[in-house]
UniProtKB/Swiss-Prot annotation:
Catalytic activity line of the entry: L-histidinol phosphate + 2-oxoglutarate = 3-(imidazol-4-yl)-2-oxopropyl phosphate + L-glutamate
Protein name: Histidinol-phosphate aminotransferase
InterPro entries, per the entry: Aminotransferase_I/II_large (IPR004839), HisP_aminotrans (IPR005861), HistidinolP_aminotransfase (IPR050106), PyrdxlP-dep_Trfase (IPR015424), PyrdxlP-dep_Trfase_major (IPR015421), PyrdxlP-dep_Trfase_small (IPR015422)
This protein's record includes keyword Transmembrane helix: no
Length: 362
């Protein structure tokens, strides 16, 4: 008889990443994981390759070089930064450090699935606050959060909706939460947002000791394979995360590639410009097919389908897969009538629109 794990662990449904296979089709187009359409910086790739002769050496446990590069690029203090194996690890470390069994965790209705995993791993209770027009609603979050709320997770911008709330609204949220509640701002897609009312939360985290911002190298920097993220916050919070992270949680290749990536502002600029052009194209073209597309500031779009037999999201997903186009079903988020499509290359984006056009006209 197998040894039983801690109560609640077997209730966790493992995270399922975006698929990369279409049965019977060689080299399908993967638009299911919000990966960078331009790949990664050549400088980052070269920096990673240069570590090949040093694989017998342990990396710097504090990722000092990387933290200093992030600090210089972003105008931050290196001692207020901690790095992790993707921002996913940092979110899990926050749960490990701050959540007790029975604590309340609050997220927005369509929040990133990892928040639920973090809560369940720690035996905490997750409450989802209703959204308004697929956008986080500060009033609803405040209503859901009481004195017993330990963490509020806010993805801003949010995945899978692609929407955001303004810096003023984020500040209003923090001001309305209990002092004992930690506000975690997941800004994985921050670099794609160019709207003047948006801010990733860095200024708020700099001012307060109850806010932390998580970031990733997987999106704008295109380093998803290396699993690299970072967080910025008050020294007391960062110190706690250093105490619960692994001693060598970020590998040498990630440190070197991340350092080169954060310094390659030209690649970041090209990534943003590509995304701005093609996210607008997808919204306009797919909207022209009679499908609703949620306005997105990220490198993906959320497409809504009717419940008409033969034209549902599930039908569209099956058809697109048969054409070698893999996008993401989002029913685990409570969005059974929608699909999420990553912004790809020009060829991939046009191919997606053509396939959806054929599907809708059939």
């Amino acid at each position: 008889m197998a040894i039983e794990p801690r109560a609640g662990i077997l209730d966790i449904r493992p995270y399922k990443p975006g698929s990369s296979e279409a049965p019977g089709i060689e080299n399908p187009v993967k638009l299911s994981s919000n990966e960078n359409a331009l790949g990664c910086s050549d400088k980052a790739a070269a920096a990673m390759t240069a570590t090949a002769s040093k694989l017998h050496l342990y990396p710097d446990g504090g990722a000092t070089k990387l933290r200093e590069a992030i600090a210089e690029a972003e105008g931050l203090e290196a001692e207020n930064i901690v790095c992790g194996t993707g921002s996913d690890e940092l979110l899990q470390l926050l749960g490990r450090a701050y959540l007790n069994p029975g604590d309340k965790v609050v997220q927005s209705q369509y929040g990133f699935l990892v928040y639920r995993l973090v809560a369940m791993q720690c035996g905490a209770n997750l409450v989802s606050a209703p959204e308004r027009d697929y956008r986080s609603d500060v009033d609803a979050i405040l209503e859901a959060a009481g004195d017993d709320t330990r963490i509020v997770f806010l993805a801003n911008p949010n995945n899978p909706t692609g929407t955001y709330i303004s810096a003023a609204e984020v500040r209003r949220l923090r001001d309305g939460l209990p002092a004992s509640t930690l506000l975690v701002l997941d800004a994985a897609y921050a670099e794609f947002v160019d709207n003047p009312d948006y801010e990733a939360g860095i200024e708020l985290a700099r001012e307060r000791d109850d806010v932390i911002v998580t970031r990733t190298f997987s999106k704008i920097h295109g380093l998803a394979a290396l699993r690299l993220g970072w967080a910025y916050g008050n020294k007391a919070i960062i110190d706690v995360l250093h105490r619960v992270r692994g001693p060598f949680n970020v590998n040498m290749a990630a440190i070197e590639a991340g350092t080169a990536a954060i310094q390659d502002r030209d690649f970041m600029k090209r990534s943003v410009e590509h995304n701005e052009e093609w996210v607008a194209f997808l919204r306009q073209q797919i909207g022209g097919l009679g499908l609703e597309v949620t306005p997105s500031v990220c490198n993906f779009v959320l497409i809504h389908f009717p419940e008409t037999p033969g034209k549902t999201a599930a039908d569209a997903d099956a058809y697109l897969t048969s054409q070698g186009l893999i996008i993401r079903a989002v029913d685990p988020y409570g969005l059974p009538n929608a699909l999420r499509a990553t912004v790809g290359s020009e060829t991939e984006n046009r191919r997606l629109v053509d396939a959806l056009s054929t599907f809708m006209k059939a």
